[in-house]
């Protein structure tokens, strides 16, 4: 066992890494699998097996046997997606374009008697007039015509007779309500509910309560954010076991000192994603109430306590993750498990980093009165880089490990870098959170509340697209300038170029998921329906990320103590990885509809 342990540690050591562009090419498979889900979801049942075959299995093949030709594999998946999307749109157009009955329902622009009215600023050009019966017009205007003026509710005699008995006009209102029971608004079923009645200026036709309630429930969800976080988790889960097999390319494993690889950016992406969804708990509350969003849900820390009290509250919430870190430490040391000491140190592991970074962010939160999260992240990263350059880097790369600090020098020295990544994730989360804010201006008369909020969401989505484009270009420019000046990326140090790389990578791919939900039309009547855009399996993984991550770590350890993974042939390696990912998918499916908070 000792010889195998040494061979295994050498197997995962001294990795030279790969180019950033090859890592981006491999990561494009995730976007291609998401596009494939959007294309195929109308034709399949959304069960566990289909979720696994579409969302998980292509990603597993993309980071293993197809990682040497990622663009070919991505193109193959994209062609399939494009074919099904094109077919869906043709079918949808053929069934959603009924022919207009001649002589009954004419738009103003169809008539040759009067020129069409110009469209209003509210977009009322898309609204069609509806022909009503005389009784319907009279009721909509507040009165009902009667052939006998003496019995008319609005006649002088009737008004004077009821003036003393009903000075507030309550009986008149009740009388008109009773007349409503015999009136039916016969509007054709293919006419939308937002209509402009002629000659009455506006008549609001209420939608069914079920439809409205369903829209209100789903409108706060952000599908692109859910899928982005779930794919980040899924790629991490795949890589932590696949790296132990020879079928996983060595250049995708973690680099020793300097270099870039898929697993290097995956570690930082985990911290970036944690910051992205911690926006609600660490940022000041918005001026208006926000709808609950499962994609942005996080435990909330009250803003009223003192900074010291807030730190204690955050530390208390991090205790479960710290416990997981100590459990992993005991299991690794107690089972003589092969470990790579230069990743985090002798005793440190990634759970400790995840637990401490939010606590440190709470400690510096008072500075956000003067500086943005992103500015704080850049400042901390630059100061950390100065400290590394002139003092700390030589200590980290030395062989001495006497004392608790030197034994875990990688874990302690990389904390400022991961804190910077977390703060930049918080900054991006501030922009994403605006999509969940309700509109503040009054809606126009031709829009229902739901339509107004939906149009507001679409405008905010376009704004977010432009913001993410700007941030992506900015982070890539910073990274390119640093590398051009001779800087090197180091995950082990979490130095400034590593921070810029993680920020650029995650901002770009978050933009990619957002563009897919915006550009690819859904084959249903609602382009942004979360039931179509969010695979149920990925939704469950997003809601129970830490539980999934813990299960993956336990299964990884079980596989490694059960077989000599580095000597397994390709067919056996892929079989074990498929069984492993299917088991993780089953765990996520069991947790579907729940939220396990650790």
UniProtKB/Swiss-Prot annotation:
Pfam families reported for this sequence: GWT1 (PF06423)
Bias type Low complexity, positions: 117-127, 144-162
Pathway assigned in UniProt: Glycolipid biosynthesis; glycosylphosphatidylinositol-anchor biosynthesis
Sequence ranges of Acidic residues compositional bias: 107-116
Membrane topology according to the record: Multi-pass membrane protein
GO BP term (any one): protein localization to plasma membrane
A single GO cellular-component term on record: endoplasmic reticulum membrane
GO molecular function ontology, one term from the record: glucosaminyl-phosphatidylinositol O-acyltransferase activity
Subcellular location: Endoplasmic reticulum membrane
Alphabetically ordered keywords of this record: Acyltransferase, Endoplasmic reticulum, Glycoprotein, GPI-anchor biosynthesis, Membrane, Transferase, Transmembrane, Transmembrane helix
Major localization listed first in the record, in broad terms: endoplasmic reticulum
EC number of the protein: 2.3.-.-
Glycosylation sites: 560
Spans annotated as Disordered: 94-127, 144-167
Calcium recorded as keyword: no
Its job: Probable acetyltransferase, which acetylates the inositol ring of phosphatidylinositol during biosynthesis of GPI-anchor.
PANTHER family, sorted: PHOSPHATIDYLINOSITOL-GLYCAN BIOSYNTHESIS CLASS W PROTEIN
Membership in a protein family: Belongs to the PIGW family.
Protein name in the entry: GPI-anchored wall transfer protein 1
Organism this protein belongs to: Cryptococcus neoformans var. grubii serotype A (strain H99 / ATCC 208821 / CBS 10515 / FGSC 9487)
């Amino acid at each position: 066992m000792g010889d195998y342990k040494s061979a295994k540690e050498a197997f995962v050591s001294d990795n030279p890494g790969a180019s950033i562009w090859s890592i981006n090419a491999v990561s494009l498979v995730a976007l291609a699998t998401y596009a494939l889900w959007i294309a195929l979801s109308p034709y399949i049942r959304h069960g566990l097996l289909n979720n696994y075959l579409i969302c998980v299995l292509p990603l597993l093949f993309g980071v293993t046997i197809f990682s040497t030709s990622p663009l070919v594999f991505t193109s193959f998946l994209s062609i399939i997606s494009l074919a099904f999307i094109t077919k869906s749109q043709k079918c949808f157009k053929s069934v959603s374009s009924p022919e207009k009955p001649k002589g009954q329902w004419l738009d103003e622009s169809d008539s040759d008697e009067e020129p069409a009215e110009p469209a209003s600023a509210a977009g009322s050009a898309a609204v069609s007039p509806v022909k009503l019966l005389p009784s319907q017009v009279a009721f909509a205007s507040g009165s009902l015509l009667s052939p006998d003026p003496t019995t008319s509710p609005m006649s002088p005699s009737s008004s004077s007779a009821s003036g003393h008995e009903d000075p507030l006009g309550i009986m008149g209102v009740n009388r008109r309500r009773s007349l409503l029971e015999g009136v039916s608004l016969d509007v054709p079923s293919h006419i939308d509910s937002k209509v402009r009645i002629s000659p009455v200026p506006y008549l609001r036709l209420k939608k069914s309560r079920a439809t409205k309630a369903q829209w209100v429930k789903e409108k706060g969800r952000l599908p692109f954010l859910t899928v982005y976080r779930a794919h980040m988790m899924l790629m991490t889960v795949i890589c932590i076991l696949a790296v132990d097999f020879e079928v996983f390319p060595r250049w995708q494993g973690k680099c020793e000192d300097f270099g870039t690889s898929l697993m290097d950016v995956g570690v930082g992406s985990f911290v970036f994603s944690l910051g992205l969804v911690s926006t609600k708990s660490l940022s000041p509350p918005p001026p208006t109430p926000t709808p609950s969003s499962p994609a942005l849900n996080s435990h909330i820390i009250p803003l009223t306590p003192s900074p010291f009290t807030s730190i204690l509250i955050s530390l208390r919430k991090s205790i479960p993750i710290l416990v997981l870190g100590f459990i992993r430490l005991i299991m690794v040391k107690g089972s003589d498990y092969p470990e790579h000491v230069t990743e985090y140190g002798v005793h440190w592991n990634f759970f400790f980093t995840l637990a401490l970074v939010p606590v440190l962010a709470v400690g510096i939160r008072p500075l956000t009165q003067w500086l943005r999260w992103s500015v704080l992240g850049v400042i901390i990263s630059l100061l950390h880089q100065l400290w590394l350059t002139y003092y700390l880097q030589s200590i980290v790369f030395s062989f001495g490990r006497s004392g608790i600090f030197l034994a875990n020098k990688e874990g302690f020295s990389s904390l400022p870098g991961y804190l910077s990544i977390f703060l930049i994730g918080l900054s991006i989360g501030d922009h994403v959170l605006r999509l969940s804010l309700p509109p503040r201006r009054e809606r126009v008369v031709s829009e229902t509340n739901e339509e107004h909020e939906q149009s507001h969401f679409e405008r905010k989505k376009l704004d977010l697209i432009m913001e993410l484009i700007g941030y992506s270009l900015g982070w890539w420019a910073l990274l390119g300038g640093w590398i051009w000046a001779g800087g090197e990326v180091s995950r082990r140090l979490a130095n400034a170029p590593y921070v810029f790389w993680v920020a650029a990578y995650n901002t770009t791919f978050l933009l990619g998921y957002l563009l897919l939900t915006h550009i690819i039309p859904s084959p249903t009547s609602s382009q942004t329906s979360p039931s179509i855009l969010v695979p149920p399996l990925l939704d469950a993984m997003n809601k129970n990320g830490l539980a999934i991550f813990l299960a993956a770590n336990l299964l990884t350890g079980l596989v490694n103590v059960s077989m000599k993974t580095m000597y397994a042939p390709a067919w056996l390696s892929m079989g074990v990885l498929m069984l492993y990912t299917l088991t993780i998918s089953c765990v996520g499916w069991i947790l579907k509809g729940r939220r396990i908070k650790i």
